[in-house]
């Protein structure tokens, strides 16, 4: 704890914690970009892979699914995409909570 600086010490401490969060956010951003999260539909016949930022990376179709109607294939693709997006968004939310969950900014009424 910084002593002898009154409110300036609290501000300095808050700035240090803000820098820690920023550094952690940069690490998290890189980690999210490198993640691969797979959403599936049709018991794995259709797979959509996204990264931790919900950016699509790959679509995989089992040849068996191509025997289905266009409507069925579209529904399976949409289901797999939503599944992948949901998992990715939840992963991002949890990781952000881990990053910011223990942050308190003393004297600023924010933590």
UniProtKB/Swiss-Prot annotation:
Keywords: Cytoplasm, DNA-binding. GO terms for molecular function: DNA binding. Its main location: cytoplasm. Gene3D superfamilies: Nucleoid-associated protein YbaB-like domain. GO terms for cellular component: bacterial nucleoid; cytosol. It comes from the Bacteria. The keyword DNA-binding applies. Coiled coil: none annotated. NCBIfam families: DNA_YbaB_EbfC. Binds to DNA and alters its conformation. May be involved in regulation of gene expression, nucleoid organization and DNA protection. Belongs to the YbaB/EbfC family. This is Nucleoid-associated protein CYB_2894. It comes from Synechococcus sp. (strain JA-2-3B'a(2-13)) (Cyanobacteria bacterium Yellowstone B-Prime).
